[in-house]
Amino acid sequence: MSVLQVLHYPDDRLRKVAAPVKEVNANIQRIVDDMFETMYAEEGIGLAATQVDIHQRIIVIDVSENRDQRLVLINPELLEKSGETGIEEGCLSIPEQRALVPRAAAVKIRALDRDGKPFELEADDLLAICIQHEMDHLVGKLFVDYLSPLKRQRIRQKLEKMAKLNARA
């Protein structure tokens, strides 16, 4: 397994729409394993393949405190959503920035697991929010897209400044 490079906003590759996975095979399973390693190394709770410049419909999530409840979503589909909630979300592709994002309080999805077996899942609370956040990545949407243009511009400027400082270091 290896840690993959996470793309950072405003990189245009984050806006690409991910293609469905045609077959879950050893290559896809290796991508899933590398994504988990990357997510844990970056101290995240979710990661979409788009964020590591792999434009396939793959998501990994682990919202558990002990980091021992891995969830793999390949070709996820949203079946139902209900209620309203929102928390200050962060994103590995938008480092050190957080913002309140409106989300459904509960979701029901269908996806394939790491072995290509279909399953359905009902989720609420943090898991539902994380699923929605990561599914947004698969269609090129970021949490900053829910913000006002002014807030989005401020975040972009902060990240561009951080990138310049890091390039000099």
UniProtKB/Swiss-Prot annotation:
Its EC number is 3.5.1.88. It comes from Serratia proteamaculans (strain 568). It comes from the Bacteria. The gene is def. The active site is at E134. Removes the formyl group from the N-terminal Met of newly synthesized proteins. Requires at least a dipeptide for an efficient rate of reaction. N-terminal L-methionine is a prerequisite for activity but the enzyme has broad specificity at other positions. It catalyses: N-terminal N-formyl-L-methionyl-[peptide] + H2O = N-terminal L-methionyl-[peptide] + formate. Fe cation binds at C91, H133, H137. This is Peptide deformylase. The lineage of its organism: Bacteria, Pseudomonadati, Pseudomonadota, Gammaproteobacteria, Enterobacterales.
